[in-house]
């Protein structure tokens, strides 16, 4: 939540990227005790949320959503009573919480596995906080040498409607915008998205002026 000029935080990133049009203040639940972060511990072990392998992980999943959404529902039910009803979690009044971020202890799994940073929307499992339904969420991992505040901003940008700009197919070197756009690569501190992306998906820019010869 830090918002000093040089602070590296998701709040400060969106403050600058939106030209002070968006405040991205986060609230942590369960509430910390002194300087200790308190976490929900699930009823299943970690390998239950890793891909199935007949030999190395027979308890693993074959359907990600069937494991992930019940997990997130239990986590929400665990913390729901901590969230004050005075906190506005649905600013557009559509009945859904604007966004929820789940931070999971430990390191990431393989690309696109359940234990990999992603944005998604819950379905098939209904979870509520103060009468508001959980829909769009970000899934983040606590520990990683690669994922930083940039990943927080990347996944939150998905929640705001921004698409990925990298190619999903392995074996290709195509990188449309490389390190020049948050939705294509990660840097620390996080780089901004392109002017077009901020105009098209963020609607933080009214128009893009055409710069021609002699302008």
PLM features: what roles do these ranges have?
Residues 3-130:
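Active-site-proximal segments of metallohydrolase catalytic domains
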Residues 99, 105-215:
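Extracellular hydrolytic enzyme modules, especially secreted metalloproteases
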